[in-house]
Amino acid sequence: MKRPRSRLWYDGLENTPHRVYLRAIGFTSDDFQKPLIAVVAAWSEAGPCNFNVLPGSLRVKEGVRSAGGVPLAVPTIVVNDGINMGTPGMRYSLISRELIADTIEAQVASHGFDGWVGIGGCDKTQPGIMMAMARLDLPSIYIYGGTAEHGVLDGETVTVQSAFEAVGAYLKGLIDEERLYEIEKAAMPTPGTCQGLFTANTMAILAEALGLSPLGSASPPATSSERARELARAGALAVGLVETGLTPRRILTYEAFYNAIVTLMAISGSTNAVLHLLAIAREAGVKLALDDFDEASRKVPVIAALAPAGKYTMVDLHNVGGAPVILRKLLDRGLLYGEAVTVEGVEIGKLLSKWEPRTDYNILYDFDKPYKPHAGLRILRGSLAPRGAVMKIGASGILKFKGAAKVFDSEEEAFKAIERGYVEEGDVVVVRYVGPKGAPGMPEMLKITAAIVGAGLGEKVALITDGRFSGATRGVMVGHAAPEAAVGGPIALVENGDEIVIDGEKGTLDVLLGGDELARRRDKWSPPPLPKQGLLRKYAKLVTQADEGAVTH
């Protein structure tokens, strides 16, 4: 079997000391003749999303061995997004994406691996692994650790989204503490990632659309036997990739990224996917810009009623066929590049011929009768965000909003204002200095958005920020405003009472101020100081703006 890299580390008399190290952990002479496969486990017990990744890595190793390879497990880090919402820890979420890519590069590049498998779960582990795949360009495959089962309370589906929104309902007096506690206990009955079409499940589906994951591998729940089989299959496929020499950059063409973008629009996926696809494309050397997302958003309606746009979860999608059923619909509509190659070594169009298109008008809809007549996301530009912003419209359906600004320089300020009833119907809440450099780390605003929705203001108040949104976000929400406040973007110049106009149909985002007034305010503006030390300071100095994927190189 082929061993393009490991032979350079472990063959020959001069590499005798290297073999000593592996014999110390149980290698036999036969093992040195087999492909060496890294099993990169983004594992952590600090939350449910990646809790099952370590035992899952054992399944991957079984698959590697079954195909004639030798697996070695190596770790990478995890920051659990949900647990860090609304805390200082959320600043480390997006930063962890870069750290994951960097740590994988360091480990896989330096130990002579012939190929590797990355196992992810929570939001940033997935794009971090995919960025490393593109950067290293070694035979590799991404496999998802799987979603959690949804809970049931009084016959109704509940998820972690229900818990976040219940806090807002409690603060508004709409539910009591006992009901809040019942939701807390019921919302997440098993390990796995957050259950709706939030960032983790969005990225797992997009990994299939990109061709980096086997078709059908995104939707099996984390604790299911199907998930175990998918993990083992990924290990075996990795050995095959070493043999054929198929690498990520042959898969990650512009056409593959376009397939992912139209899928994102059709499922009303997380706004975070825009950042992540831009970042992965940069690693792959593919030119991708917000204009590509804008173009796709004007062609594709939402055809899946998945939470938060609808009420169904990833497990529900799995029960009707999973991501390939949606991809087949896109292919049949002429919206997917069927000739794009996948990690299975076969064009995606040929693979999708095995899946029958399905419509039930509960979870899955048709293009002629879509769930929503527009795409899930829209790109906005204007005087408030000259380089672009991302509007999530799949959940609310509201494309236009005009109101007076209420401005906050932190998430905590905004949350306290909502808590005390300061935010009212018709307001445009502006949360700034929470961008890539400003926070730093571009934290997600789920605590605020959930409080707004829970208080019954989801479609009556708009939120604009240079930060990010959780995939669980719904309401009238515009994020990723670029340039951000910390570098002097127009969002830094907005004052309380300024009229702001959001127009998702035209794709515009404007503050109704003259150029002279903006210039006067800019003369008085000064940049905030950088963090004094550590990782946050390093990140703030290196990171690019959101329209470039918020990357560090």
UniProtKB/Swiss-Prot annotation:
Mg(2+) binds at D81, D123, K124, E444. Its cofactor is [2Fe-2S] cluster; Mg(2+). Binds 1 [2Fe-2S] cluster per subunit. This cluster acts as a Lewis acid cofactor. Keywords: 2Fe-2S, Amino-acid biosynthesis, Branched-chain amino acid biosynthesis, Iron, Iron-sulfur, Lyase, Magnesium, Metal-binding. It is an enzyme of class 4 (lyase). It comes from Aeropyrum pernix (strain ATCC 700893 / DSM 11879 / JCM 9820 / NBRC 100138 / K1). It catalyses: (2R)-2,3-dihydroxy-3-methylbutanoate = 3-methyl-2-oxobutanoate + H2O; (2R,3R)-2,3-dihydroxy-3-methylpentanoate = (S)-3-methyl-2-oxopentanoate + H2O. This is Dihydroxy-acid dehydratase. Its EC number is 4.2.1.9.
